[in-house]
């Protein structure tokens, strides 16, 4: 597993809002070993889509990024598509969701969860 240093800038930026929401979700589950896995899969209307899931175990080839007491995991295939991205958590009248601003995406779907490169 590759560790990104806590104080150094990360190739993937997790905002304070995203970290706070993940902390809240982990507290609700009552399992401090949970880590948020951020991944990219084929599919969606633009070719790729983002996904989020909790995981207790980091795979050997995962990149682990620690921010504000939260560990985010990214697998090698997803990492290449997420370098330079910012992951935020937004609350609005339309609902609450994690939002990824990805400079590598050439097009995105209206829902914001699908993209192409």
UniProtKB/Swiss-Prot annotation:
Q: Which GO terms describe its biological process?
A: iron-sulfur cluster assembly
Is Metal-binding there in the keyword field? yes
* Requisite cofactors: iron-sulfur cluster
Task: Give UniProt keywords alphabetically.
Answer: Iron, Iron-sulfur, Metal-binding
Check the record and name the InterPro entries matching this protein. Answer: FeS_biogenesis, FeS_cluster_insertion, FeS_cluster_insertion_CS, FeS_cluster_insertion_RrpA, HesB-like_dom_sf
Picking any one GO molecular function of the record gives: iron ion binding
Say what the protein does: Required for insertion of 4Fe-4S clusters.
Q: Which family does it belong to?
A: Belongs to the HesB/IscA family.
What is this protein's name?
Putative iron-sulfur cluster insertion protein ErpA
| Organism encoding this protein | Chromobacterium violaceum (strain ATCC 12472 / DSM 30191 / JCM 1249 / CCUG 213 / NBRC 12614 / NCIMB 9131 / NCTC 9757 / MK)
Designated gene of the protein: erpA
């Amino acid at each position: 597993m590759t560790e990104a240093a806590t104080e150094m800038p990360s190739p993937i930026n997790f905002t304070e809002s995203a970290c706070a929401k993940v902390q809240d979700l982990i507290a609700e589950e009552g399992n401090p070993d949970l880590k948020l896995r951020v991944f990219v899969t084929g599919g969606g209307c633009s070719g790729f889509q983002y996904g989020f899931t909790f995981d207790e175990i980091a795979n050997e080839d995962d990149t682990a990024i620690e921010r504000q007491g939260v560990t985010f995991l990214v697998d090698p295939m997803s990492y290449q598509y997420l370098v330079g991205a910012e992951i935020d958590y937004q609350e609005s009248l339309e609902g609450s969701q994690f939002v990824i601003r990805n400079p590598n995406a050439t097009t995105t779907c209206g829902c914001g969860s699908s993209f192409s490169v």
